[in-house]
Amino acid sequence: MSLYRKHRPASFGDVIGQEQVVSVLEKQIKNSNINHAYLFSGSRGTGKTSVARIFARAIGTQSTDLYEIDGASNNGVDEVRELREAVQTLPFQSKYKVYIIDEVHMLSKAAFNALLKTLEEPPAYVVFVLATTEKNKLPETIISRCQNFSFKKPHESDVRELLILVAKKEEIELDKGSLALIALLAEGSYRDALTILDKVLAVSKDKRIFVHEVEKITGAPSSVLVNQFLEALVTGDKKKAIGVIKDATDSHADMRVFTKLILRSARFAMLLVLAADMREFIKNEISDEELVFLGSLGKGLEAKKLPNILRALLKAYQEISVAYIQSLPLELIVAELPT
């Protein structure tokens, strides 16, 4: 069984990073104030379906009265009409029948119209939980008939917290660098973080995972290349910087991830210059070797150097996804370095 399925939260207390959603739902259950329709929206892997299942169990719905529907593959008007007929039957064992419709934005216009009729006058024993990653694609008539909950994209610290919990349960040793890199690569998705950990664990011999293994399995650029490029930018060494970009390209590194890692390191270097008390915070984010490197990088620099580099990197990061040549935005940064 995959780590994500094995460690899916089983109760509200297990949910990480969605305290505002959990708090409201728990109060509604305590006060027996259950709505007939809920809309859970947010980016992928943030726990929408997991919380929907927990909510269903918390209001006493047995498995025989819980229905999960994939909106992507059941998006026609006929399927929704069948659903409308099904909701008319009483629950088998529970007070409520709960219908979880995932990726609800994939329904057709005709299907939405059919669903709307059910949402307008649902039986008292039916609860709908609609989940979507693209709320903007839903008709306003659907949104207005649901109680809306926005699932926030978790911070890297939230993702790291989950990874630490799972690693402890599975008796996995994760070094600080691998923990930080997996959290960054997951891009705010708990599911993606555990999927990456699963993938790395599959080739690990003794459940000890180091950052170089994560780099190798995921194709992430090495920290050596990241540090070399950042150092070249700071010192104005154009030849070295172009050489590092070539090395990253030759190793088939994802230039978007490469730039993101450089951005993170440049930001930490700037924070170390601006506020010495940030050192403790940064120490928990990166390896001791990186901390020493970034601390020395900012020494003696003019005040605007690192902020200017960060602005250029941010611009490059935004341009990479639309660039015909992925390395070009970084190459332009190098070309525009003062001589």
Model-derived segments and spans:
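Extended, largely alpha-helical regulatory/partner-binding modules appended to the mid-to-C-terminal parts
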Residues: 46, 52, 58, 79-82, ...
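P-loop/Walker A NTP-binding region and its immediately flanking N-terminal helices
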Residues: 1-148, 154-158, 164-166, 246, ...
